[in-house]
Amino acid sequence: KFILWRNKCMNYLELIENRNSIRDFHKKKVEQSKIDELISFFNSSPKLIDVDVQILVSADDDTASRLSGVAGYRGNTFNAPAYITILSEEKDNYLINAGFMAENLVLKLEEMGLSSCFLTSDDSEMIKKVLLINSDLAVATVIAFGYGKKERDTTKLDIHSPSNVSISNKAGHIAPKIAATALAFDSDFNAPYNFDDEYSDPVIADAVYAASLSPSFLNHQNYRFVINGTHIYLFNQLDNVVPDDDNLLGLGAAMLNFYIILASKYSGIGNWRFDTSDIKADFKNPSDYTLVAALDI
């Protein structure tokens, strides 16, 4: 069961909206008390599957330089004062689970006033070597975090379709995103979900919107939701641009954001399940989209 951790007076959706991937940090060290709180929080966090997962926090002065060229997009680690390494047993869907747990942790960082940025981590053994990690578990992901510098206001682009792009202003670093309206379908891929319909569920609309704000490699957002009453079906696309590992981590992050909104509004909802062998519906999905998980509200 997913345990909500935020005070009821604080809104999960606002927290998700406020989270940005920060790439510039102050040199101020993160207090040990906050690091201890993060580790404790992660160790009690829910999982999507039964898997051994561990967290290590590196806050030494030379951590950024040791990781440079080994982790991060094109080897850039953004000189953060601290780094989280999530280690996982390798089994089916372990990267999706790692993304799910990591996004939950990133939202906790945001609540604590700490900024963060996911780093690509393609070479598990090399990362473990430079960080002196002695473990048989694989590096699932690395997160840079600390006290972020305020970034200038910028233009936010929401891509509804190639010919329909909306523009708005928002503080901080914002990369173009696929709009929520382009991520959800009603019963099958031939019918876009009508968020404006008087009978549509506003909580589901918020959940899709929250998922659309989750971190995604190069903001490709390869996931799609098919909504059929109280049943949610999650599809994923593998492409030639986004590495498979980063794709699956991003999928897990989207699943967390979607689920946490539902769990904050509804009681007794089910959990994401990966066994979809009993689902026989024709979703008319493109051949490059695969049904990955289902959720019953």
Where are these regions (language model features)?
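Acidic, surface-exposed loops and disordered segments
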Residues: L4-I297
